[in-house]
Amino acid sequence: MHCPFCRHPDSRVVDSRTTDDGTSIRRRRQCPDCSRRFTTVETCSLMVVKRSGVTEPFSRTKVINGVRKACQGRPVTEDALAQLGQRVEEAVRATGSAELTTHDVGLAILGPLRELDLVAYLRFASVYRAFDSLEDFEAAIAELREEQRERPAVDDEDHEDAGAERQGTDRGSGGTVEVPVPATVAD
């Protein structure tokens, strides 16, 4: 690393620390020639190849802005959007690839967005997957409904007692609830 003051071709690393968000390394350096200190920040560049073939750096802000449009009018907080942006960036960096396509980034967004808000997920998926007809929306909604049907079945198997309690309270005005018989001294 060249010294920015005297242009000496070498420098010594005095201290290294990761930044708070963990995406870069901050290094404190000292020039062996002029003894002045300076700071460098190293980040791993992550490039996104767009459909047009243009390559640009990955931007968490761009991800959040795109998802924000899908969440317009929905009860989604800015904090939740920031967390989603961080999860997406972590997911795409975890691939280990220096270049990703917009398709890869879109796939990384769909999972966390589905967990965040189903309506926003449908809005985003309709653009990302280029829905052309009502059948495309109906198929996506049917997929979400099927997933919701399967999810309580898994939860009930894991938490049978909680499911029994829920079953008794969710029946509404016409349902009956079994009351356990108290134990007697003879038991």
From Swiss-Prot:
Cofactor: Zn(2+)
The keyword ATP-binding is assigned to this record: yes
Domain ATP-cone: residue ranges: 46-136
Region Disordered: start-end pairs: 146-187
ZnF (unnamed) ranges: 3-34
Keywords linked to the UniProt accession: ATP-binding, DNA-binding, Metal-binding, Nucleotide-binding, Repressor, Transcription, Transcription regulation, Zinc, Zinc-finger
Molecular-function GO terms, alphabetical: ATP binding; DNA binding; zinc ion binding
Annotated InterPro entries: ATP-cone_dom (IPR005144), NrdR-like_N (IPR055173), RNR_NrdR-like (IPR003796)
GO BP field: negative regulation of DNA-templated transcription
Co-factor binding details: Binds 1 zinc ion.
Homology family: Belongs to the NrdR family.
Role of this protein: Negatively regulates transcription of bacterial ribonucleotide reductase nrd genes and operons by binding to NrdR-boxes.
Protein name: Transcriptional repressor NrdR
Species of origin: Streptomyces avermitilis (strain ATCC 31267 / DSM 46492 / JCM 5070 / NBRC 14893 / NCIMB 12804 / NRRL 8165 / MA-4680)
Gene responsible for this protein: nrdR
